[in-house]
């Protein structure tokens, strides 16, 4: 795990030195959620070394839309299992590699695009992401860069670049938060209808782009009220599409008041892997 605090200059990091002769493999990944980014310039190797061809990417493809849990936030704080998060952790415990979404992809031998952003809700101006001008998934799901501070500002995503076989949609945990006001109440009929319609509009648009994909709607084991799960279940039923399902973990909404740690992330991945595996090979293009 490498951290650095310089934003405007090239940094050279020693990955390995004095290796024995032979074939070596490097796996490079970004630990934090989608709004964190770095520019990868390249590898420097020994003058006597050579770069071999990468093995082909898996044919199976998963895409995940989620929040901090899907991004693996605070998952390495293993001394705080089933507890609130450590104070002022500043992201040092984040590791997307150990998110249930990425574990599931590895379990199933699939590529994954993990569009997971900590604090995000469905609606703009709700949730916790990008205070005080909160940005919701309704403005994020179809963007490559979705925050105005990016080097090129907000940029659209070309859905032709990646067509998943399976879409995981795990948003809803942060939606009660209404900064400076009472939390949104999913049991209120008017709000419930508004929230469900916004959620469905995203799914319907994604379905139009991925007509053959299997969609799995879910919330995670981070504590939340069961009415949110019921609302997601209603959405799945109302969409009336046999390839759009609602999945619940054994401990959905009940396992921890803080972010899921490594044991809980792997627990979720095991259950989600089994769920997708039980659908058979037909879900993969």
Predicted regions and their residues:
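Extracellular serine-dependent O-acyl
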Residues: 214-285
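Structural recognition of the beta-strand scaffold that forms the well-ordered cores
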Residues: 61-65, 70, 112-116, 165-170, ...
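N-terminal secretory targeting modules
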Residues: 1-96, 283-285
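Sec-exported extracytoplasmic/periplasmic mature domains
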Residues: 70, 109, 113, 172, ...
């Amino acid at each position: 795990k490498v951290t650095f605090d310089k934003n405007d200059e090239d940094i050279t990091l020693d990955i390995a030195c004095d290796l024995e002769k032979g074939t070596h493999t490097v796996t490079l990944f970004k630990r934090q959620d989608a709004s964190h980014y770095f520019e990868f310039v390249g590898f420097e190797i020994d003058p006597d070394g050579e770069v071999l061809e990468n093995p082909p990417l898996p044919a199976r493809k998963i895409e995940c839309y989620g929040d901090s849990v899907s991004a693996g936030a605070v998952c390495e704080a293993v001394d705080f299992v089933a507890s609130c998060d450590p104070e002022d952790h500043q992201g040092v415990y984040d590791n997307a590699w150990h998110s249930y979404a990425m574990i599931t992809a590895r379990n199933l031998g699939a590529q994954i695009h993990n569009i997971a952003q900590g604090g995000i809700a469905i609606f703009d101006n709700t949730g916790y992401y990008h205070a005080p001008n909160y940005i919701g998934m309704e403005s994020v799901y179809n963007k490559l860069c979705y925050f105005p501070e990016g080097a090129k500002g907000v940029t659209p995503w070309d859905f032709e670049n990646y067509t998943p076989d399976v879409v995981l949609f795990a948003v809803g945990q942060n939606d009660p938060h209404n900064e400076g006001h009472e939390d949104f109440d999913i049991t209120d009929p008017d709000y419930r209808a508004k929230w469900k319609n916004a959620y469905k509009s995203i799914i319907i648009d994604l379905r139009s782009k991925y007509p053959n994909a299997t969609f799995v709607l879910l919330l995670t084991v981070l504590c939340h009220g069961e009415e949110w799960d019921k609302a997601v279940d209603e959405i799945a039923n109302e969409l009336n599409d046999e390839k759009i399902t609602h999945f619940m973990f054994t401990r959905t909404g009940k396992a921890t008041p803080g972010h899921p740690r490594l044991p809980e992330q792997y627990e979720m991945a095991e259950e989600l892997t089994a769920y997708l595996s039980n659908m058979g090979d037909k879900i993969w293009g």
